[in-house]
Amino acid sequence: TPPGRFILFDSLRDKDTIRVLREAKEPVVSALDELKDKGIRSIRDFYADPARLELAQGLDEFRRKKLMASCDNYAILREALWMLYARPFDPVRFGQLISAHHANLRDGLGISTPEIEQILQTAMANGAYGGKVNGSGGGGCCYVYCATEDAEKILRAVEAQGYPGHILKGDKGNCVEA
């Protein structure tokens, strides 16, 4: 568990999960299918050989934008995963990665909402390192990552705008101890 806290917020906006996921996924799957004859089987192929991203230039703008956002999010995921095991841990960079992931979801895949953006902007203005939509997007929840000492202030600022939140406490979970 990284140091600091995660705060989960509810945007109080209903969403159509199946529609949101379909609209984000189908163009990426279609783009990958079109690139199959060029040796592309998955997003991981672009991560393994970034020069292959040039192949996306032959796609229409709509699918290219969604594919590129998905490729970038995979690279962000890999860096963030590596950071969780790195010492010393850099909470500021970790927050930046979370926000960069959200930017791809918002700008590339179109799955944020004005409510989610308001929550994230308020949290960032009050000290959060980063934040993103949670789950399928299109409404629902988001979370932010922050220093432990800033969590209550961030929670109060966002709740003052009418969005309930909950500070999450990390735990190592179930494990086998020798």
Language-model features, listed with the residues they occupy:
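N-terminal pre-core extensions flanking Radical SAM catalytic domains
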Residues: G138-V144
